[in-house]
Amino acid sequence: MAEWIECKISDIGTVVGGATPSTKKPDNYENGTIAWITPKDLSTFSGRYIQHGERNITESGLRSCSTQLLPKNTVLFSSMAPIGYVAIAANDVCTNQGFKSVIPNENTNPLFLYYLLKYNKDKIEGMGSGTTFKEVSGNTMKNIVVSVPTDKKVQERISSMLGSIDDKIEENERINNNLATHPCNTRIATKQRRQIPRMDECLHTDGKVSDRGGNEETAEQFSSLLTA
């Protein structure tokens, strides 16, 4: 049986904030080639891997503020307005101040970290503070306790299972978006949605992804380990 341990987010990755180059200086943005992500970009983003946002910044824009260039596979987590948008950097990106992103260390699978943060969204949001709107500080993010398997291969198996479910969801969404508004096609789309397993239905005891589940105890165990 895989060993799970409780640890802080800072034990499994490096927490990094972001910033906004001055919009009063056109040179910070015009013809920029560096992807710069804001929470607004993630509000309309439904995938897992993000390449760029609505705007890019330039090298001078990057140097002008405290935003940092984050490497591919960094997990972006919005820490304000709102808390809880999650995506994985598909390439080098930087963000505004609305993120506390996590660069996974060598013992942490990036996709597992993505799902771990998604599962702990409510917990993290509950630790936010502020009067006008809630915000999660860098120090708070670093010290949030999560439960993770020590074996990276176990992390990879878990993320692969959950990734298979998301792959199916995304495939069905693409199909549904291409269907005409004929009543028959509406019924097809409804049937496809019913075939997508809920997260708590995804495991059998043999660890395989299930279309409909069938082992409630294993699923509950799995969910509780992720959200611990």
Regions found by a protein language model. Give the residues of each.
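Non-catalytic DNA-recognition/assembly elements of restriction-modification systems
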Residues: 1-20, 143, 147-210, 218-219
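A short glycine-rich beta-alpha junction/loop motif
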Residues: 2, 79, 93-100, 130-159
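DNA target-recognition patches
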Residues: 6-16, 23-61, 194-228
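A short beta-sheet element
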Residues: 18, 38-40, 54-118, 128, ...
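Short clusters of hydrophobic/aromatic residues that line enzyme substrate/ligand-binding pockets
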Residues: 29, 50, 57, 86, ...
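A generic structural signal for well-ordered coil/turn residues at beta-strand boundaries
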Residues: 30-33, 66, 82, 89, ...
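Short glycine/proline-centered loop/turn elements that form peptide/ligand docking sites
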Residues: 50-52, 65, 172
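Structural signal for hydrophobic packing residues in well-ordered secondary-structure cores
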Residues: 121, 125-128, 169, 183
